[in-house]
Amino acid sequence: MFSRLSVPGPFAAAASDGRRRQNIHNNYFLALDKRLSIVRHLLNPCCMKPLFRVTILSSWASLLTAAGEDGKLAIYSGTYENGVFQSLTFVNPVMGWDAFFNSGFRGASTVIGNIEAGNIWFGHEAFVRAPGATTGFSTYVNPAAGSLNELDYHATTVGHVLAGSGYIPGDNGGSFSNFGLGMAPEASLVSAGVAVDFSATDLGSFSTTDDSVILPYRAFFQGTGLAPGLARPDVINSSWGGGDSSATWVKSLAIDALARQNPSVAHVASAGNGGTATVVSPAAGFNSIAVGSLGGASFLQPSSFSSSGLADFYNPAESGGTNHAGVRVAVDLAAPGEQLALAAYKGDSGSIGASSTLGFLIANPVPTNQYFLNMDGTSYAAPFVAGGIALLKDVANSVWTAESKPEAYDTRVIKSVLMAGAEKTLGWNNGQNAFNVTTQALDVKTGAGAMNLLTAADVYFSGNQDIAEGAARQMSGAGWDSATIPLGGAFDYVFETAFAQETALNVALNWFSVREFDNLTNTGSDIAFSNLNLEVWMLDGNGAFASKIGESMTTYNNTEFLRFDAVEAGRYGFRVTYDSKIFDLSNAVTQESYALAWNTVAIPEPSALFLLLGSGVLMWKRRRV
């Protein structure tokens, strides 16, 4: 799925100003100021912070490409040591991105929103669009009192991952740069900043107010106050966070409530860089998709810095309000987040402008062709997922419309599809015991696993799509369903045909925490929390549920997930139950809407696989689950 190579050739001779440069395909110069090493991990308790680690090394370097590549590649990850690159990896294809790009699905029909401390600087060459492009970039001016609305280097690196264009003007229609392409290079991208102050001493830390956070999220979720003609975003990325692991602060409640009331707008948030520390908000929210970071040779190794601590659950109806500490997994998915080369903004604003020690980085005019190296953090894992969602919705727009099939665009469906299509990461463990029962559902660092867009697309488009109601809903080998279940109810799903051989199986169930947003007060409120469970059964010869082979039964999470590396041949089914409510302040919640998605992969017998390998041609391709 990805290439790995050693960088050929020496660096070019140093320029007179001390910088080393290399001509890329005779049309592209890259340079990087690398003088100071700074590694930041978790958040300062007093401040919000973008969730990243940055390394700025102590020399100048040029980024090199591999000889013979066609240029239609992606963001790089690589190890840079002692003045040379040890290796480079093209990151986007690891997640199945290239199939979308080569098929012409590059996000052109979608809008991505990015909300964090500062704004994206769209003056970098990574954001140059081809002549005649009908999509582009815009900045939302935060109207909250004290909002700085400043350009920031961190937002610019995140924007590169989301929708870097990579277009280089030139003869014959130009070309795409190796370093420029983001996940959705033709999507519209709108940026908003929430900071009212940047720290002078702690790089990346910033302060906010309730209004400075809530107003841009309200605008993006509801599609108000954006650039003329710009539709509300299909997905919002949040690469920042701080505190509130119970997701009950004013900001967190508002974001979660807006996500529930506007389900066609997916919200993706970075999990944090605290290692074993608790996942913080907005990623700790219930109605978002929280993303952890991956590294390693195949990007299946959980990053050591990626936050994995269990989040809290606050029950407002219990004893006047009770906080249950460390009772739920907050991470939903994982994506690459290590050693990335990303667009550099070196202007006198945002985090760098406020810093008391990094003034030497500031350049005027701001160079348009420089890249930060060795960028780590869940801040970058999240936009890989957000950009991936834009690609899925771009394809969806060629199949359905939001009006004709609104459930297909629902965040609960998108989240379940991505989980069902996720690949097992190294050391993945969701607490399934010998009887395949789990009260945890997800792995603490990577959730359901590594995002795999190819498998997700198979689940989303190729299988069942919103199954008709019946006594038992009939399923093919992959697909999704959305339904509304009454309190105390149980809905059954059965595979149309039996598995003829051992089969790998993923199944994901998601629903929303009931939180409501008040447009008059700009606040969110906690209303109710439903407790659904997910069971997997083997059927008997008459098609009846005979023996339960697994169950995901969390108490304080709104996700259930099961992974079977192999179930024996036979016919199977799922059962979704709505057993109880953890609380209901309204005393009016009698049903809950959910999304279910699943994926199966037949496992060939060793003898059959041996014959294929022995012939010298591997004809079988196992879908990654």
State what each model feature region is.
Residues 28, 33-44:
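Short, positively charged and aromatic/hydrophobic N-terminal segments
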Residues 54-63:
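Bacterial N-terminal signal peptides
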Residues 69-209, 229-235, 245-248, 261-264, ...:
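Subtilisin-like serine protease catalytic core
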Residues 342, 349-356, 530-569:
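Exoplasmic/lumenal beta-rich domain surfaces
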Residues 410, 415, 493-495, 524-528, ...:
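C-terminal edge strands of extracellular/lumenal beta-sandwich accessory domains
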Residues 437-530, 590-601:
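Secreted peptidase-domain scaffold signal
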Residues 605-621:
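A short, hydrophobic C-terminal helix/tail in secreted or cell-surface proteins
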